[in-house]
Amino acid sequence: MGRRKKMVERVTMLMNEPTKIRNIGIVAHIDHGKTTLSDNLLAGAGMISKELAGRQLFMDSDEEEQERGITIDSSNVSMVHNFDNEDYLINLIDTPGHVDFGGDVTRAMRAVDGAVVVVDAVEGTMPQTETVLRQALREHVRPVLFVNKVDRLINELKVDSQEMQIRLGKVIDHVNKLIKNMNPEKYKEGWRVDAAAGTVAFGSALYNWAISVPMMKKTGVSFKDVYDYCKAGDMKSLAEKCPLHEAVLDMVIHFLPDPIEAQKDRVKVIWHGDENSEIGTSMTHANADGDLAFMVTDISVDPHAGEVATGRLFSGSFSRGMEVFTSGTAKKSRVQQVSIFMGPERLEVDKIPAGNIAAVTGLKEAIVGSTVTTLDGMEPFESIRHVSEPVVTVAVEAKHTKDLPKLIEVLRQVAKEDPTLQITLDEETGEHLMAGMGELHLEVIAHRIERDKNVEITTSKPIVVYRETIKKKIEPVEGKSPNRHNRFYIYVEPLDLEIVSAIKSGEIHMNLPELERRQKLIDLGMEKEEAKGIVGIFNSNIFIDMTKGIQYLNETMELILDGFEEVMRAGPLTREPVANVKCVLVDAKLHEDAIHRGPAQVIPASRQAIQAGMLMADDTLLEPYQKVFVQVPQLLMGGATKELQGRRGIILNMSTEGDLAIIEARVPVAEMFGFAGEIRSATEGRAMWSTEFGGFDIVPTSIQNDIVGQIRERKGLKKELPKASDFLSI
């Protein structure tokens, strides 16, 4: 126990020296070796025994993770590493690489300042590597590169030492190309990865060795020696001469920024308040004596302590008993415990200063993305944006009726822990619907509900989440209130796709200062008057008021928007969410007496005008797509392409690398169920494949009616398709 106590003392001492702290994430594509790398770094830092590292999967502390052999949640751990005779505190987050858990990566990126990007030397950069790198650069997180599984190049692909260097060079070039395209200004500032400079390390996480140019100078081991050791299968000597943790952690300390350096640059990206205000300055300088500013990036449940909110402390210090505000709620909470992580364990400490990753209990109101502060009314941090959208839904029911109240509570809890999950109650069928990133995501959540929360559940077959949209612009439609005293004239038209993507990426929203929002929309091609008239944005739809001087309109606008939002949540054709629609109010006639223009009159009037308008404008379904990447031996390529095309897939690109064929395709999510088993049998089990979210596209006309019919039947709606006249009161 003595060693552990010493470790805790070192960690608590270093916590107070921001220049000695590095907050880093490890990111990569699935199975490129993130968790094995994390474990060996821990072993090197004396956190777990060296014999067990890599097999223990310390970071995968969840049974589900150990069973599936993949990381599902982001794990936090703190450790100490000595570099140039000085101790440094490294807060490490291991993130999942599976596309269904991309949400965890996005959240982890908010807490860290640097990222070790892990790439498999044999497979090279893969789609998920691009996705995670893009998330890191968007949050201004600086990357360094670790090329893993170098031994496989030598022993499995039998390349010679010259070919090995060429291949490794290609991997580095490709990563730099990605950085340059994703964030040109940071690339110019020197964020490229460069082996000669020392921002790239090569090695094998499993066999616990790594080499970089600074390490070669230090140990005298050359590339040729590495090649010879691998060829001879003598990994042990390599691991003794060039320990993995030393090469990687030295690189992290030398090249990745400390919190003070990082926050100067990052605060303006993730916080839109006044940089010169007291709290703005305090965050930019990671001031431990300033007001508290803490961003929650994860919520988990501890059986003893209750909800634990983990996140990054940008300003101030956390201590027990302090009272704090949480964004979005009016009442204060009292902090109960403050702790840091060591693997899956939390260690309670008295105080945590700015620049650290902290775990806090007592913040009942907090959700992922919350801002926690001692200032009343502080401008919250920008909300965390996820790259994908939920595309698959299952209905969840409790096996035993007595568990129903517990199930409702558990679903609320699960949604709080994982913000990429959407939980809704279907009012008509009474079912609870769970929408997630993919089949695996929902399977894992369902398993956890049963295992951790002890609620037995049954889940329906997965259902695809569709969207409704329109194809053309129509003349204004009149919506009348039930008492006939109020009329609204609204037309709908498709919203420009550039504006849609600006809304989705969070660039345009209603909380922006009006002039700034207006200018951004004009730059994207919207007319000035329209940009001026925006009164509501909901999902990727907007509502514009183009009327002039209508009495009482201001008082009723909120109700008109309620009607608009109701339709956007559930469109007229299939009651699926609506996307990419612009609704424009051009005229209105309102009763002078407020009693005759209440919610029961105004909401139905605006709702019906939009519903009828959408049906007149060719209401159509959009279906979600996934990009599918398949690596397969060239001889078996035919089976793989046939499998993809048989699922309405479009082959976007085919290339070859050695004897491997790499196929890139786009396939509707509806056709992807059961793909794992089928692709295995089509390619004799030799295909490696992965997916990422591929956006939405219009459903082909030939199958549109069938799909609409199936959705309506599932939701208990009438078989006949609705007509515009059904929504207009004559």
UniProtKB/Swiss-Prot annotation:
Entry keyword set: Cytoplasm, Elongation factor, GTP-binding, Nucleotide-binding, Protein biosynthesis
GO MF annotation, one: GTPase activity
GO cellular component labels: cytosol; ribonucleoprotein complex
Residues that coordinate or bind GTP: 28-35, 94-98, 148-151
Compartments, as annotated in UniProt: Cytoplasm
Record domain tr-type G: where: 19-228
Top-level taxon in the UniProt lineage: Archaea
Gene3D superfamilies to which the protein is assigned, alphabetical: 3.30.230.10, 3.30.70.240, Elongation Factor G (Translational Gtpase), domain 3, P-loop containing nucleotide triphosphate hydrolases, Translation factors
Record-listed Diphthamide modification sites: 596
TM helices/strands, residue ranges: none
Family membership noted in the UniProt record: Belongs to the TRAFAC class translation factor GTPase superfamily. Classic translation factor GTPase family. EF-G/EF-2 subfamily.
Function, as annotated: Catalyzes the GTP-dependent ribosomal translocation step during translation elongation. During this step, the ribosome changes from the pre-translocational (PRE) to the post-translocational (POST) state as the newly formed A-site-bound peptidyl-tRNA and P-site-bound deacylated tRNA move to the P and E sites, respectively. Catalyzes the coordinated movement of the two tRNA molecules, the mRNA and conformational changes in the ribosome.
Protein name: Elongation factor 2
Provenance organism: Methanosarcina barkeri (strain Fusaro / DSM 804)
Lineage: Archaea, Methanobacteriati, Methanobacteriota, Stenosarchaea group, Methanomicrobia
